[in-house]
Structures are given as C-alpha cells and as structure tokens.
Amino acid sequence: MDALEITQKLISYPTITPKECGIFEYIKSLFPHFKTLECGENGVKNLFLYRIFNPPKDHAEEKHAKENVKPLHFSFAGHIDVVPPGDHWQNDPFKPVIKEGFLYGRGAQDMKGGVGAFLSASLNFNPKTPFLLSILLTSDEEGPGIFGTKLMLEKLKEKDLLPHMAIVAEPTCEKVLGDSIKIGRRGSINGKLILKGIQGHAAYPKKCQNPIDTLASVLPLISGVNLDDGDEYFDPSKLVITNLHAGLGANNVTPASVEIIFNARHSLKTTKESLKEYLEKVLKDLPHTLELESSSSPFITASHSKLTSVLKENILKTCRTTPLLNTKGGTSDARFFSAHGIEVVEFGVINDRIHAIDERVSLKELELLEKVFLGVLEDLSEK
C-alpha cells in the first residue's frame, strides 16, 4: 500500500481529540509481524508497534545480552487526532476527496499525511542487518498531551524500549516539501502578573493609586521585550502579553489592581529563573504578585547529528531541496522524546492549511515524503 491509499483511509476516521475511533485496529492490521503495546488514560489511546529485523541467532543471544549490544532502534512518531473541522468545507472533512492533484480532508497535513507516509515506508522497509523499527502514535497531541506520547514514552522506559532516534512527522515545510527540518523547539513559560493599587473615585485621582498608571510606566520593559539575543537556530526569547484585565466595568471607579497574562517563548539562553529575576528587577518597589509556570522546555538536536545528516541527505536526493534547520513554531511531542535523551527531529509536509477549512496535501508530497522516509530507514540500517 502506498502513502496515498493509507492516508485516505486514515482521514476517513473522525478522530477529533482524544477520540481514536478504531483507527489503531486498521493500523495494526497493516503490521501483523510487529509486536504491539497499548496504553492510555482519560479517554486517550496510544499505540506502539515494533519489530526487530534480523535478530541474533539463538546461540548468540546470550552473548548479545551479556555485551548489552542492542541494534539501532529508530522510531517514527505522530498523532492520529485532529482538531474539529468547523463549517463551510466544500466536502465532508472526513470523506477524503482527490481534486486537481490534492487530497482534501481534515488531518491531510496535520498530520495524517505524514503518518501515512511513514506507515507506507515502514511496510516497504526490508533491512539486511539487525535493526529495531518502531511506530508510536497517540490520540492526544492536539489536546493537553498529558496522557499521550509523554505517557507512552514513560511506559517504554520501564520496558527498556526507548528508541535511540525518532522522526516526528509534523508538517514542518513552508513552501516546498523539503525546505524545513525542525531540529528543536522553543520552550514556553506562562505568567500572571498582578499590579496592585488603591481603588477610588475617578474624580479624585489623588486619593487613588491607579495600577494602570503603574503599568504604563513599566510596559515598555515587559511587552514584546527580547529576553536574550537568540542564536543560529533560536530566535530571541520574547515576552508577549496575551491578556489584560482591570476594573469593575464602571466608568467612575479606578481599579484596585490590573492583571497581566503573558507568555514567553524562549531559547536555551532563558529559563524560568532568569525570567523571574528580570521581572522582579523591573518591578522593584512596585506592589505586585508574580506567578510563572513552565509548560515546556526548549531543546535542540545537534545539526551534525547522524539523524539530521541522514535526513538532510535524503531530502536533497529526493526533493532536490536543501532544508533549513530551525526551531520555529509552537511546541510539539518531539519535546517528550528529547526529555529522555532521544535524538529527535521533525519533518513532514507543507503546513499552509493546517487547522484550516479545506485542509489538503498534494499527492506529489505524499509520494516524495514516503521516499524520503524509506531512504532514511535504509541509510540508517546500513551505516
């Protein structure tokens, strides 16, 4: 089966987060020779398929175990859940349609197209040397992600089945297939700042202490400020205000406090501790409370790593494009792999219609992506 046929089938399952809708039974049916592990909580389902190709002969297994020599374990990872489709689609979002060289349907780009490509590549892979290939899928990436990939990796660690390397098939490309590989992601820190004042009558400002005036005095040092200068792969860390709230809604009462909600997407150069230190310095002598919570940590895979190099070579060979290595965008499940010391990168189709009405992926992209993934498998098994 090719990537197109598999992707069409995947799209037909209405797997809105965290629903799995039986899609894992279909995927398992494609891999009868793979072992299976499943886990999940709170309505989330996760699937892990794995197979050791060309395992050591029986007489060598004891020696193999004693030497603690394991074959390279490579994993393809992704999510089968999608965001709600909304209205105004030209066709039923869960009835895939091919039109003018594109496959339409919810999840075509994010990320059933990528999953279809690596499932097809895995089916066509037949190494000549010992090699452990696995596939990790979750129904909770678009949601909280607490019981998805993170949980499955914890289970794999308990069973000594963590992969050495992984590609997460997120839609990373911007204009043409092959123009972008994500070798890391920025971290994310959420914050709430409350500046305190004294409520009073708007006609008697001297008897009040308006916290909005206080905010105005420090706003240039908070809103949109760069927290570091970034580096070759990370943009400068930036603090972005996402919500402001103050007052009772009355036009003659000054507020007792103003609440500022913000987010900081940050590189390895900025931490929750350094952000707190910066803000406390800015807010010195101002009555306030500050809460910070890190929702994800930044990570990066070396640009010269074996996985990155092999992927780049296959993209250039198949797509005739030299990929840009970057860390742009939001968070992804790749961070959970990195937290376990796994060499991980992200690569997939163009992302111009992710989460959009009439989401689509080009048929040519699916064909080329499958070839890239198969080439990666073949090269890793030979090197």
Swiss-Prot record:
HAMAP family: DapE. Zn(2+) 1 binds at residues 79, 110, 170. The lineage of its organism: Bacteria, Pseudomonadati, Campylobacterota, Epsilonproteobacteria, Campylobacterales. Pfam families: M20_dimer, Peptidase_M20. One of its GO terms (molecular function) is metal ion binding. Its EC number is 3.5.1.18. The active site is at 81, 141 (proton acceptor). Zn(2+) 2 binds at residues 110, 142, 355. The gene is dapE. InterPro entries: ArgE/DapE_CS, Bact_exopeptidase_dim_dom, DapE_proteobac, Peptidase_M20, Peptidase_M20_dimer, Peptidase_M20A. This is Succinyl-diaminopimelate desuccinylase. Homodimer. GO terms for biological process: diaminopimelate biosynthetic process; L-arginine biosynthetic process; lysine biosynthetic process via diaminopimelate. The keyword Zinc applies. Keywords: Amino-acid biosynthesis, Cobalt, Diaminopimelate biosynthesis, Hydrolase, Lysine biosynthesis, Metal-binding, Zinc. Binds 2 Zn(2+) or Co(2+) ions per subunit.
